[in-house]
Amino acid sequence: MFVDKRARSKFWLYCVITSLALCDIASAQKYVQTNLVSDVPGLAATTDPNCTAPPSKQGCAVLNAWGIAFSSTSPVWIADNGSGLSTLYTGAGGVVPLVVTVPPPKGATGHSAPTGIVFSGSAAAFQVTANGVTGNSAFIFDTEDGTISGWSPGVDLHNAILAVDNSGTGAVYKGLAIGQSSKGWFIFANNFNSGWVEIYDSNFQWVKNFTDTDLPPGYAPFGIQNINGKLYVTFALQDADKHDDVAGPGHGFLDVFDLDGNKLKRLISHGELNSPWGLALAPPNFGKFSGDLLVGNFGNGHINAFRIDDGAARGHMLRPNGGTLAIDGLWGLAFGNGAAAGPTNTLLFTAGPNDEADGLFGSLQAK
């Protein structure tokens, strides 16, 4: 059979171009994970200096590292769920010698269990008082104990101050966001037990609750993030006690609300979601997923990318060897601030590996 040489050349050229394109696509979604700080010796570049007798967890602070926040210039603040503390680091993993205690409910013994943390940019909102001194909160925490606390350095450098205590009603706060509208400053706390997102004003006074009433039974607000003035809220499946999530393929939803709690749209249903919690909008220089909404699954540790306008799936992060990037116990996601928290195209993450018994702070960069 005669085969035209020109046709054969075009065929091979097509094969080469296609192969190169596929290689380019695969490499573009590969990301390098760097473990910066952990309580587990050898897991990260730095072992938690608060650990007094490694490998035991005695004195350790970075346990089940959860929420992550910072100002435009500050280092990274992490809510350490397993120790009731907040520890500070640079974006490169340098230890900042300040440890803040997040208080438990009134009259409770033991440490608190902080989850969400936000930075407040207001000079007069969210004031707390202790020992006759009043100041605005720079960082605000919520906890699985059903409390919300504010940290004001002029009030107490080493302790956040209890501002809201709903432990008596069984509240279990899993996430926290902050936002400013024409009506003022507000915080938004995900009550996983009740299934509502609770809004509080700048005086820590309850305003109202909201949720997605179209969800299947058993789903409750899990993660939350203010992105470009809109609230992105993830929903996870509750366990029988309505305290923890039930992980599994497709177990999750993601909605978008305005700052008044009005649902704007359902962005993602099921699919690659698996107890989603971490949320971050990628900058324009983050490899294949530049400009995409990144959603971290606590359930399987995957980080999936979606178009932020319509929720179309864009794939998930891969390791340099082509395998799926999975971070055990993945929680928070946040891009650096271009200052102490690291480059703006470096994705910082927190995690509670080994069934939330340990903690990890690290970073991800496009390869």
What are the residue ranges of the model-derived segments?
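Sequence/structural signature of beta-propeller domains
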Residues: 28-367
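Bacterial N-terminal signal peptides
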Residues: 12-23
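Short, flexible coil/linker elements and helix-boundary hinge sites characteristic
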Residues: 3, 21, 54-57
